[in-house]
């Protein structure tokens, strides 16, 4: 459920004040306003839904970030408008946090979006989408390019994440190696001078009732980064 909107097939919808298909998305084009700190705030509502999103407008790879916001907004509104009216409107909230490391021009920038979505199921869903950028090379940073080649970072990261999540949640069940050593679960992260922060969607590493979670891993305890 948590990835429904990101993978939904989008159908045509006409929304007054929103950009036509193919138009470059922007804060104003999304119906938002730029507030202090170069943060775009988008709020929209109707009889069937409420939508509230905040995200930066000065990220170096802004197109990728705004495209993801737009895709999720459009998918959510299409699903909500095509569903029966209910007592409580469908809800989507998106917030963001930012991190950085180093000093320009040898620096990185991270933006992490957190989505909360209620589509009327038994349990709302929460997930993350992270964007990382190397200002020195003008290239996005992914988990595949994050570490020096020839290293095995998850051998160090996995046990730290397991201990940190157990400490935070009090949930003592072990994360199986088949899950904890799978790079697919570490795609959403932020880079700081001292640590990597990994973000996990609801149900990704721990049972859904635990909720979305994050774990901070000291850079001193893992292989060197390729940045």
UniProtKB/Swiss-Prot annotation:
Q: Give the catalysed reaction(s), semicolon-separated.
A: a fatty acid ester + H2O = an aliphatic alcohol + a fatty acid + H(+); an acetyl ester + H2O = an aliphatic alcohol + acetate + H(+); a butanoate ester + H2O = an aliphatic alcohol + butanoate + H(+); a hexanoate ester + H2O = an aliphatic alcohol + hexanoate + H(+)
Q: Which GO terms describe its biological process?
A: lipid metabolic process
Enumerate the subcellular locations listed in this protein's record, separating them with semicolons.
Cell membrane; Secreted, Cell wall
Q: How does activity depend on temperature?
A: Optimum temperature is 38 degrees Celsius.
**Does the record's keyword annotation contain Kinase?**
no
Q: Where are the transmembrane segments?
A: 3-23
> Which controlled-vocabulary keywords does the entry list?
Cell membrane, Cell wall, Hydrolase, Lipid metabolism, Membrane, Secreted, Transmembrane, Transmembrane helix
Topological type in the membrane: Single-pass membrane protein
Task: Name the source's superkingdom.
Answer: Bacteria
Q: Which Enzyme Commission number(s) are on file for it?
A: 3.1.1.-
GO CC annotation, single: extracellular region
Activity versus pH: the note is:
Optimum pH is 8.0.
Q: What GO molecular function annotations does the UniProt record carry, in alphabetical order?
A: acetylesterase activity
- Pfam families attached to this UniProt entry: DUF3298
Q: Would you identify the family this protein belongs to, as annotated?
A: Belongs to the RsiV family.
Q: What does this protein do?
A: Hydrolyzes ester substrates carbon chain lengths ranging from C2 to C14. In vitro, acetate (C2), butyrate (C4) and caprylate (C6) are hydrolyzed with high efficiency. Has lower activity against laurate (C12), myristate (C14) and caproate (C8), and weak activity against palmitate (C16).
**Name this polypeptide is given:** Esterase Rv3036c
Identify the taxonomic lineage of the organism of origin: Bacteria, Bacillati, Actinomycetota, Actinomycetes, Mycobacteriales
């Amino acid at each position: 459920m948590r990835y429904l909107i990101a993978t939904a097939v989008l159908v045509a919808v006409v929304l007054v004040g929103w950009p036509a298909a193919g138009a470059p998305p922007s804060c104003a084009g999304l119906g938002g306003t730029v507030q202090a700190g170069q943060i775009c705030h988008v709020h929209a509502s109707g009889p069937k839904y409420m939508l509230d999103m905040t995200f930066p407008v000065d990220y170096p790879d802004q197109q990728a970030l705004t495209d993801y916001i737009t895709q999720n907004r459009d998918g959510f509104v299409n699903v909500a408008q095509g569903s029966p009216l209910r007592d409580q409107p469908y809800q989507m909230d998106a917030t963001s946090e930012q991190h950085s490391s180093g000093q320009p021009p040898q620096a990185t920038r991270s933006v992490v979006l957190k989505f909360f979505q209620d589509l009327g199921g038994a349990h709302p869903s929460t997930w993350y989408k992270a964007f990382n950028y190397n200002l020195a090379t003008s290239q996005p940073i992914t988990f595949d390019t994050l570490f020096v080649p020839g290293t095995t970072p998850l051998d160090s990261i996995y046990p730290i994440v397991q201990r940190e999540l157990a400490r935070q949640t009090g949930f003592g069940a072990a994360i199986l190696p088949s899950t904890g050593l799978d790079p697919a679960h570490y795609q959403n992260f932020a880079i700081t001078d001292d640590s990597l922060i990994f973000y996990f969607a609801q149900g990704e590493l721990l049972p859904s009732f635990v909720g979305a979670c994050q774990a901070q891993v000291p850079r001193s305890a893992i292989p060197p980064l390729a940045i």
